[in-house]
Every structure is written in C-alpha cells, then in structure tokens.
Amino acid sequence: MMSFEIKEWFNAKELEGMPGVPKLATNITRKAVAEDWVKRQRHGGKGVAYEYHINSLPEETRRAIKGASLSDKPVHTSIVHTVDERLIYAMSFLTPDEQAAAVEIIRVAGIKGLMPTIVSKDKALEALGITVEQQKTLQTLQALPPEKVREILSQYEGKEHNFPVRENDVKKAV
C-alpha cells in the first residue's frame, strides 16, 4: 500500500504566495501572532524563527497545501493507488485518534462499517433530499408484495412525481 505524509509544520517563508496568507513572510508572521497560530521554534537558523502547525493556518491555505501535496505525487495508472491517495487525503482531515478509530473500523468491518460513524442513515437521506414522509412511503411499499407495488406505481405513471409521495397515498391504494 502506498503511503505518504502531509507536512504538518511550515515556516513563514514556505507560506509565501499561498492563498489565504499575506505575500511577504514578515506579514505572515504578523498574521500568525495576531491570530495566535500554534507554533514551535525552528532551530538551526539565525535568530528566532518559528514554524506554524497546518491546523492553525487559514482553511484556504490548508486546502492549497493538501491539494498540492496530492498533486505533487506522480500520476498512477493503477486504480488502487488512486483509491489509496483519496483515502489518505480524507484521513488527513481527522485527528490522530479519529484516524486510529477509522482504521480499526475499516480493518474489522470494511468501508461499509465506517459509513454509520460518519453520517447517520437519516442524515444521508436528508442530504439526498428524501423527506421522512417519503422514507415512510418507501417502507410501506417495501412491505407489500411486488405485484401490489407495481399496481400502485402504475397509477402514478405520467404524473408529476411518478411515485406516491405520501404514506397515506399507498395506504389508500391498498
């Protein structure tokens, strides 16, 4: 499995020209002080220099760094590497504890096991624009024999929705 790390600490000089931060290193340092970025002292240079943690940087800057980190990698012909890279990228947004938990869930239950921890079924359906009433309608339809479902759905062909919108519509048809 291919793996790579996204760098976590950046000095002001490395951040020059990045989106979301000033163009000059001195102004980046001022912004870091004003916004209280997490920093550590950098050793080996003249005077006092700091590196700033990626999680302290503006969102726009973090996205650019993470995007550049992925795009700097050679293009792979194997789909496995593409999936690996996307998974690594997604995991980079998690804390170390969340990463460990996600890896364990995937190891035990596969990627399907991870989904309920990310988003509930109700939230996923809501994101798709499926209302609670539509969910109830679907559950009612699923409980019926297939021939009855076909009969009910045939009544809605050519209509605006092509399906019963409310649970009561199904109950009336039964």
Swiss-Prot record:
Primary site of residence: host cell
The keyword Coiled coil belongs to this UniProt entry's keyword annotation: no
Coiled coil region boundaries: none
Subcellular localization, as worded in the UniProt entry: Host cytoplasm
Keywords, alphabetical: DNA-binding, Early protein, Host cytoplasm, Host-virus interaction, Latency-replication decision, Repressor, Transcription, Transcription regulation
InterPro entries from the UniProt entry: DNA-bd_dom_put_sf, Mu-type_HTH, WH-like_DNA-bd_sf
GO CC term, one of those recorded: host cell cytoplasm
Induction: Expressed in the early phase of the viral replicative cycle. When present at high concentration, negatively regulates its own expression by binding to O3 (PcM promoter). PcM promoter, and thus Repc expression, is blocked by Ner. The host SsrA, the ClpXP host protease that degrades Repc, the Lon protease, and the stationary phase-specific sigma factor RpoS are all influencing viral repression in response to either temperature or stationary growth phase. Decreased availability of host SsrA in growing cells would favor latency, whereas starvation would favor Repc degradation and hence induction.
GO MF terms, alphabetically ordered: DNA binding
Region of interest (Recognition by host ClpX-ClpP), ranges: 170-174
One BP annotation, GO: latency-replication decision
Domain HTH Mu-type: 6-73
Assembly and interaction partners: Homodimer. Three homodimers assemble as a homohexamer.
Record note on domains: The winged HTH N-terminal domain cooperatively binds to the enhancer/operator region of the Pe promoter. The C-terminal domain (CTD) regulates DNA binding by the N-terminal domain and degradation by ClpX-ClpP protease.
Function, as annotated: Promotes latency by binding operators O1 and O2 in the enhancer/operator region, thereby repressing the transcription from the Pe (early) promoter and blocking the expression of the genes required for replication (lytic growth). Competes with DDE-recombinase A for binding to the internal activation sequence (IAS), which overlaps O1 and O2. The outcome of this competition determines if the virus enters latency or starts replication. Makes the cell immune to superinfection by repressing genes expression of any subsequent incoming viral genome.
Record-stated family: Belongs to the mulikevirus repressor c protein family.
Protein name: Repressor c protein
